[in-house]
Amino acid sequence: MAYRIFAVCIGVLMMTGLARPQQVLAYEDSEIVYSEVAGKLGQSDEAAWLTEAILYAGDLYGVDPLLLTAVMEAESGFSMNSLSPVGACGYMQLMPDTAASLGVDRYNPLENVLGGASYLRTQMERFAGDGDYGLTEAVAAYNAGGGAIEKYGGVPPYSETISYVGRIGEIYRGLLALAED
């Protein structure tokens, strides 16, 4: 119901010139993103906030919000409290050096999402290729680092990274299928 009201509000804002077309496109993905996030967190204020943060970060950095959703789900299961054994933390599992290089506070929920989106965009630009190939390399770089991708000329032979790329591909394809319905 809330998203139906949101749609009417966006329509009014578009008619008055206060909303951009990209915001309307983001709305089309918002129900899918919210459904995926709420599937893990339940229908909650956090799920609604996180959906908006994903849409905002996707718009800001030019990253498909469905891809950001897939990365976040694989990285942290949508938990800001997630901490990896190697020290990555938050929704997007930012490492200390990565967060510092991006100029974000990885313990701040919004900055964590924005930092992850920015880093993913950087990897997408760095490993741009034809279609899925470039995206696969970018996702692998998000996990293993760009140096590993360059060293091996593609996805490195690390079992964790191979599994990670497969997991994100599976989630992302599922979200894209929902968007096509």
Please tell me what each predicted stretch does:
Residues M1-F6:
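Bacterial N-terminal signal peptides that target proteins for export
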Residues A7-G17:
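Bacterial N-terminal signal peptides
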Residues L18-Q22:
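Signal peptide cleavage region of secreted peptide precursors
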Residues V24-D181:
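Catalytic glycan-binding domains that act on GlcNAc-containing polysaccharides
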